[in-house]
């Protein structure tokens, strides 16, 4: 064999079998940075149609987690695939840099502003801290292979962005959407600030659930309304609440106008009580109160009790019964304790009746000094004291510890309160913002489509947006209000423009350093500067204007796509929609795509306490970023995304199949120069033409899947192609031709041309997902080419040609089915030790007329398809008794060990081996390939 092995076309490539991604990827990143790859991509798309994916900014605090990785990788796949489709798709990553979490971190280092450090110095420390966090996260995102303008990302703390945020607020004000009001807002007593809806989490909490009697000011008159005359016992209306601490702020009792209410007399421990309850809840209440007996004295509709007055159980005033649509009979008594300063529904119904918005609670959750009974007590600690006082006053009918879902601060994980405070709001209804936003939601494509109904419900039910915060590190609400009337300065919009210009030069500190007289002149003494800062959701929510609308690479083109986790319907998607609609009357996006959260193999959230956290840094250091990227792409992101070490190892296995396919392609393109060796598709061997045709069809399917953001379908089709159509069929068949045919002959060059087309296409298919591997393949492909695959478009030379004389795709699919049946019988013969490899087999196929016509069409080349040394086709009717039945009714098989000698060069067993005098160890085919013009292949 030593004489002939040099006549073989052995595969050869520098592309290693093992990716060694963890070590090699950083080297590639270094080259990408050095070569200015992102700018090369930008330059390659000048003048093309823009596609703008706007990056929702992660918060600049802490290391990135697996959820961040999912988000950034999905965005990167989209941007790269859109670029491959010819779009100008810039990607400018961003960070959210203001707000409480950064303040808390800085407080731990330097203390609270105004104590050991001035507010100005504190802001500067916050800016430094945020910049450090951005640097850390940026390095981790780059390591994932995400391409973008990492040198010039947008930061909400950039002076220009801070200024543009102020400018966007001035437009909201100009359009009449801002108002100031005393309203109940989510309030964290630990933060000392209002919270946005998106900053509220719900956790279980145990609270005292109490039934409290409010005695009528005129019991006899109330009883008469129920048809009971001259009633002698006190009559009380009963409320049920889980927030006893709000009772000092009670100003009414809400009932439903349509519900039936009963006057119930019941006996307990020798005393007679008369109470008003919703009729459907009477039995449940009597059981709860431990009534020994009870009797319904009369019923009326709730509407009949409107404005009847009842005494507050421990304060010296009385309150009215009022009608409210928010009253239900799901629990309690059918009567709702109403404190307009401590609840949204309470506030709304209170406005209708002109009730006082009482707020006896300070910023720190402690009752104010003038609060009777409870001054100086923290509200949650006062609950027990309220209960004790009610008991003392004889107003407590029942008391039990009650476990329920309760709002908590997302940062402190502590229970929050509803508290009326003077705040700045964007009104949902004054200028029809709610109606406009709902209309815009309908014009937007939501992926998955359930996102539309989700955000619609949120917009329909959301209160006015409280955009003010009482914090130090944030974009200031740059307003001047009159010291006496609290009215905005009439020139607020133009004043804000002047302030924004200063902030653009000096940052937000310019507002606090500003002497009002510089802008207001003699009016300065009549006005005061607002010291509140903006909700950070306003910062990020306005970036469609402050960033996309301002940076030159976006060309003034609107945003095409927002892509974030499914929690952002109430977060970034919502705030962006509100601000954009308030500013322009339009949504800021055309499409909104959401992905699910990451969970472990058992469906649990990632938690340090459970010990199931998968850190992206560990994955890239161990397996490589391309494995993480493949897992993201292969997972259906519309639901929860399951990740574990086992799942990532499965992704690594899948990756190896793709890598091995790429390696086979490259190794067999050794010595191929497309400039002179490329065979035209119409001149190819039929099987090669089929392979190119299949690749062309697959490319259309892959492009369509990318366009629809169905990346898991891309990976499924890619794996199917690599494993089945290529790996188990085409590549398996062509190995013999590739290795043994004449090096420059048509049979081999046809095959190499097909491999070249497939490799050129496939490197582009995988580039958005397996970016590092695609770059590695691209550098080793033969022929003249640009430096990077990422500047290319989808491969255009996959000509899907079918000649009149060609065998159809269905023909090759049938042949693949036959081949699989033959393989089963050969495998059994190997297990029976009748043969070694398949080339030691002679196979006889007994086939019906239709199948015989197909199998004989390619003549002697059938043996190359079946990977046997001999293949004979005989009529099915002639099947011998030892013929094996197959899953095809039209086919039976016999496999025998060949008696022919083995060709030393190609290992086929042929009768002529030993009969050729010049080459006694070779077959005719090999002699032709080393001395003649090379074998002729037409079909396979």
UniProtKB/Swiss-Prot annotation:
<dbReference type="InterPro" id="IPR023585">
    <property type="entry name" value="Ile-tRNA-ligase_type1"/>
</dbReference>
<keyword id="KW-0067">ATP-binding</keyword>
<dbReference type="InterPro" id="IPR009080">
    <property type="entry name" value="tRNAsynth_Ia_anticodon-bd"/>
</dbReference>
<keyword id="KW-0862">Zinc</keyword>
<dbReference type="Pfam" id="PF06827">
    <property type="entry name" value="zf-FPG_IleRS"/>
</dbReference>
<keyword id="KW-0436">Ligase</keyword>
<dbReference type="InterPro" id="IPR009008">
    <property type="entry name" value="Val/Leu/Ile-tRNA-synth_edit"/>
</dbReference>
<dbReference type="Pfam" id="PF00133">
    <property type="entry name" value="tRNA-synt_1"/>
</dbReference>
<feature type="binding site">
    <location>
        <position position="906"/>
    </location>
    <ligand>
        <name>Zn(2+)</name>
    </ligand>
</feature>
<feature type="short sequence motif" description="'KMSKS' region">
    <location>
        <begin position="605"/>
        <end position="609"/>
    </location>
</feature>
<comment type="subunit">
    <text>Monomer.</text>
</comment>
<dbReference type="GO" id="GO:0005524">
    <property type="term" value="F:ATP binding"/>
</dbReference>
<dbReference type="Pfam" id="PF08264">
    <property type="entry name" value="Anticodon_1"/>
</dbReference>
<dbReference type="GO" id="GO:0008270">
    <property type="term" value="F:zinc ion binding"/>
</dbReference>
<dbReference type="GO" id="GO:0002161">
    <property type="term" value="F:aminoacyl-tRNA deacylase activity"/>
</dbReference>
<feature type="binding site">
    <location>
        <position position="903"/>
    </location>
    <ligand>
        <name>Zn(2+)</name>
    </ligand>
</feature>
<keyword id="KW-0963">Cytoplasm</keyword>
<dbReference type="InterPro" id="IPR013155">
    <property type="entry name" value="M/V/L/I-tRNA-synth_anticd-bd"/>
</dbReference>
<feature type="short sequence motif" description="'HIGH' region">
    <location>
        <begin position="58"/>
        <end position="68"/>
    </location>
</feature>
<dbReference type="GO" id="GO:0000049">
    <property type="term" value="F:tRNA binding"/>
</dbReference>
<dbReference type="InterPro" id="IPR001412">
    <property type="entry name" value="aa-tRNA-synth_I_CS"/>
</dbReference>
<keyword id="KW-0479">Metal-binding</keyword>
<protein>
    <recommendedName>
        <fullName>Isoleucine--tRNA ligase</fullName>
        <ecNumber>6.1.1.5</ecNumber>
    </recommendedName>
</protein>
<dbReference type="GO" id="GO:0004822">
    <property type="term" value="F:isoleucine-tRNA ligase activity"/>
</dbReference>
<keyword id="KW-0547">Nucleotide-binding</keyword>
<dbReference type="InterPro" id="IPR010663">
    <property type="entry name" value="Znf_FPG/IleRS"/>
</dbReference>
<comment type="similarity">
    <text>Belongs to the class-I aminoacyl-tRNA synthetase family. IleS type 1 subfamily.</text>
</comment>
<comment type="function">
    <text>Catalyzes the attachment of isoleucine to tRNA(Ile). As IleRS can inadvertently accommodate and process structurally similar amino acids such as valine, to avoid such errors it has two additional distinct tRNA(Ile)-dependent editing activities. One activity is designated as 'pretransfer' editing and involves the hydrolysis of activated Val-AMP. The other activity is designated 'posttransfer' editing and involves deacylation of mischarged Val-tRNA(Ile).</text>
</comment>
<dbReference type="GO" id="GO:0006428">
    <property type="term" value="P:isoleucyl-tRNA aminoacylation"/>
</dbReference>
<dbReference type="InterPro" id="IPR050081">
    <property type="entry name" value="Ile-tRNA_ligase"/>
</dbReference>
<keyword id="KW-0030">Aminoacyl-tRNA synthetase</keyword>
<dbReference type="InterPro" id="IPR002301">
    <property type="entry name" value="Ile-tRNA-ligase"/>
</dbReference>
<dbReference type="GO" id="GO:0005829">
    <property type="term" value="C:cytosol"/>
</dbReference>
<keyword id="KW-0648">Protein biosynthesis</keyword>
<feature type="binding site">
    <location>
        <position position="564"/>
    </location>
    <ligand>
        <name>L-isoleucyl-5'-AMP</name>
    </ligand>
</feature>
<dbReference type="InterPro" id="IPR002300">
    <property type="entry name" value="aa-tRNA-synth_Ia"/>
</dbReference>
<dbReference type="InterPro" id="IPR014729">
    <property type="entry name" value="Rossmann-like_a/b/a_fold"/>
</dbReference>
<feature type="binding site">
    <location>
        <position position="923"/>
    </location>
    <ligand>
        <name>Zn(2+)</name>
    </ligand>
</feature>
<dbReference type="InterPro" id="IPR033708">
    <property type="entry name" value="Anticodon_Ile_BEm"/>
</dbReference>
<feature type="binding site">
    <location>
        <position position="608"/>
    </location>
    <ligand>
        <name>ATP</name>
    </ligand>
</feature>
<feature type="binding site">
    <location>
        <position position="926"/>
    </location>
    <ligand>
        <name>Zn(2+)</name>
    </ligand>
</feature>
């Amino acid at each position: 064999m030593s004489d002939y092995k040099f006549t073989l076309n052995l595969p050869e490539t520098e592309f290693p079998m093992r990716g060694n991604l963890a070590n090699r990827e950083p080297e590639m990143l270094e080259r990408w940075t050095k070569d200015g790859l992102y700018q090369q991509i930008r330059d390659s798309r000048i003048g093309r149609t823009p596609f703008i994916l706007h990056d929702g900014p992660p918060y600049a605090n802490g290391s990135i987690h697996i959820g961040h990785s999912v988000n950034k990788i999905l965005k990167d796949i989209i941007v790269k695939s859109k670029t491959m489709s010819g779009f100008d798709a810039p990607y400018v990553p961003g960070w959210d840099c203001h707000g409480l979490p950064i303040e808390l971190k800085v407080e731990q280092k330097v203390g609270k502003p105004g104590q050991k450090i001035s507010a100005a110095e504190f802001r500067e420390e916050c800016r430094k801290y945020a910049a450090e966090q951005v640097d850390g996260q940026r390095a981790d995102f780059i390591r994932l292979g995400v391409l973008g303008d990492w040198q010039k990302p947008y930061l909400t703390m950039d002076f220009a962005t801070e200024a543009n945020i102020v400018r966007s607020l001035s437009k909201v004000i100009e359009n009449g959407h801002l108002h100031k009001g005393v309203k109940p807002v989510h309030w964290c007593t630990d933060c000392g600030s209002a919270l946005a809806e998106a900053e509220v989490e719900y956790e279980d909490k145990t609270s005292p659930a109490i039934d409290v009697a409010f005695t009528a000011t005129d019991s006899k008159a109330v009883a008469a309304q129920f048809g009971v005359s001259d009633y002698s016992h006190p009559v009380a209306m009963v409320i049920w609440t889980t927030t006893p601490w709000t009772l000092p702020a009670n100003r009414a009792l809400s009932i439903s106008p349509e519900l039936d209410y009963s006057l119930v007399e019941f006996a307990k421990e020798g005393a007679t009580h008369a109470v008003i309850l919703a009729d459907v809840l009477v039995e449940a209440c009597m059981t709860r109160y431990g009534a020994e007996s009870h009797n319904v004295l009369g019923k009326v509709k709730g509407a009949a009790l409107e404005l009847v007055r009842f005494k507050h159980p421990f304060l010296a005033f009385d309150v009215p019964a009022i009608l409210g649509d928010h009253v239900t009979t799901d629990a309690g008594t059918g009567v709702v304790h109403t404190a307009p300063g401590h609840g949204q529904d309470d506030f709304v119904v209170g406005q209708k009746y002109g009730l006082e918005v009482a707020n006896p609670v300070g910023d720190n959750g402690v009752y104010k000094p003038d609060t009777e009974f409870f001054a100086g007590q923290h509200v949650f600690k006062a609950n027990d004291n309220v209960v004790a006082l009610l008991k003392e006053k004889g107003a407590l009918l029942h008391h039990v510890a009650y476990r329920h879902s309760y709002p908590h601060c997302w940062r402190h994980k502590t229970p929050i309160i509803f508290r009326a405070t003077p705040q700045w709001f964007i009104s949902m209804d004054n200028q029809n913002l709610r109606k406009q936003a709902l209309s815009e939601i309908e014009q937007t494509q939501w992926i998955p489509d359930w996102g539309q109904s989700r955000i619609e419900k949120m917009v329909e039910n959301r209160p006015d947006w409280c955009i003010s915060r009482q914090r130090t590190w944030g974009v200031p609400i740059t307003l001047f209000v009159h010291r006496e009337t609290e009215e905005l300065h009439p020139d607020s919009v133009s004043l804000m423009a002047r302030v924004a210009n200063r902030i653009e030069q000096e940052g937000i500190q310019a507002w606090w350093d500003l002497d009002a007289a510089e802008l207001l002149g003699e009016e300065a003494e009549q006005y005061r500067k607002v010291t509140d800062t903006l909700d950070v959701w306003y910062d990020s929510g306005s970036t469609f204007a402050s960033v996309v609308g301002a940076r030159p690479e976006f060309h003034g083109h609107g945003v095409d796509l927002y892509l974030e986790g499914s929690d952002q319907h109430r977060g970034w998607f919502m705030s962006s929609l509100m601000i954009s609609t308030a500013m322009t009357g339009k949504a800021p996006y055309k499409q909104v795509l959401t992905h699910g959260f990451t969970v472990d193999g058992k469906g649990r959230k990632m938690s340090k306490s459970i010990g199931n956290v998968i850190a992206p840094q560990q994955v890239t250091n161990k397996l490589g970023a391309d494995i993480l990227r493949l897992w993201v792409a292969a997972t259906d992101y519309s639901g929860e995304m399951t990740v574990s070490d086992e799942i990532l190892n499965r992704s690594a296995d899948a990756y190896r199949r793709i890598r091995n396919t790429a390696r086979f392609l490259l190794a067999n393109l050794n010595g191929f120069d497309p400039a002179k060796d490329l065979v035209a598709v119409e001149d190819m061997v039929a099987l090669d033409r089929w392979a190119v045709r299949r690749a062309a069809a697959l490319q259309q399917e892959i492009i369509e899947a990318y366009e629809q953001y169905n990346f898991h379908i891309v990976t499924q089709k890619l794996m199917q192609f690599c494993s089945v159509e290529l790996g188990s069929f085409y590549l398996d068949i062509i190995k013999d031709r590739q290795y043994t045919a004449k090096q420059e002959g048509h049979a081999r060059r046809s095959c190499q041309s097909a491999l070249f087309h497939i490799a050129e296409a496939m490197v582009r298919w995988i580039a958005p997902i397996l970016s590092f591997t695609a770059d590695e393949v691209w550098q080793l492909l033969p022929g003249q080419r640009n430096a990077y695959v990422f500047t290319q478009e989808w491969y255009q030379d996959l000509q899907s040609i079918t000649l009149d004389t060609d065998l159809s795709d269905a023909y090759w699919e049938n042949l693949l089915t036959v081949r699989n049946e033959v393989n089963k019988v050969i495998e059994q013969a190997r297990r029976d030790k009748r043969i070694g490899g398949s080339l030691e087999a002679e196979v006889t196929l007994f086939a019906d007329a239709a199948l015989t016509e197909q199998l004989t069409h390619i003549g002697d080349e059938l043996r190359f398809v079946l990977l046997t040394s001999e293949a004979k086709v005989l009529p099915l009717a002639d099947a011998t008794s030892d013929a094996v039945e197959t899953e095809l009714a039209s086919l039976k098989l016999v496999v025998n060990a060949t008696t022919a000698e083995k060709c030393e060069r190609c290992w086929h067993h042929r009768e002529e081996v030993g009969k050729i005098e010049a080459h006694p160890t070779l077959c005719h085919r090999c002699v032709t390939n080393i001395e003649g013009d090379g074998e002729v292949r037409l079909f396979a």
